[in-house]
Amino acid sequence: MSNIKLIVGLANPGAEYAQTRHNAGAWYVHELARVCNVTLVPESKYYGLAARATLHGRDVRLLIPATFMNLSGKSVAALANFFRILPEEILVAHDELDIEPGVAKFKLGGGHGGHNGLKDIIAQMGNDKGFHRLRIGIGHPGDKNKVSGYVLGKAPASEQEKMDAAIDEAVRATEILFKQDMVKAMNRLHSFKAE
């Protein structure tokens, strides 16, 4: 059984960013909300879009911060503090440069790897890195000086299809996480690669 009580999808707000690679975490939460048949609505006290969903009979909060990426922690901390949700009860979905498109992986803890959204969440959670992550592969531009433009750019259709397939699989793995446990969810997700 999962102890996850909050699932966060990282993004930049606004239509101009909606389809950019940096918003992959939000794509996952939107798909999860659709599968759970709930609607994310603006919640000013949590600085984001939020919903309450049920997965296999268990309540879980969904959140997409409406702050810019580097202020994501403000939104996550506001909701987590209000509902007394601990870092280890949080799953944060984010784009991951070090994983190719079409692959997604669960991870517990670790640093921020240069990801500004993760960096701010860690800071706002009192430097506690003990939350779960869903790392959605977006690939790497090959040159660290091109990273900013790359994450804020749109993927070509062939890559987008792979990312969408990995997100669909991540949603199925999340259902396994709530129905069974993280080990089974990881086994399912980590053996998947979109072709």
Curated annotation (Swiss-Prot):
Give site residues, Discriminates between blocked and unblocked aminoacyl-tRNA: 12
> Does tRNA-binding count among this protein's keywords?
yes
Q: Which GO terms describe its biological process?
A: protein quality control for misfolded or incompletely synthesized proteins; rescue of stalled ribosome
Q: Which PROSITE patterns match?
A: PEPT_TRNA_HYDROL_2
Gene3D superfamilies listed in its UniProt record:
Peptidyl-tRNA hydrolase (3.40.50.1470)
| Alphabetical keyword list | Cytoplasm, Hydrolase, RNA-binding, tRNA-binding
- Where, per UniProt, does this protein localize? Cytoplasm
Role according to the record: Hydrolyzes ribosome-free peptidyl-tRNAs (with 1 or more amino acids incorporated), which drop off the ribosome during protein synthesis, or as a result of ribosome stalling. Catalyzes the release of premature peptidyl moieties from peptidyl-tRNA molecules trapped in stalled 50S ribosomal subunits, and thus maintains levels of free tRNAs and 50S ribosomes.
What protein family is recorded? Belongs to the PTH family.
Q: What is the official name of this protein in its record?
A: Peptidyl-tRNA hydrolase
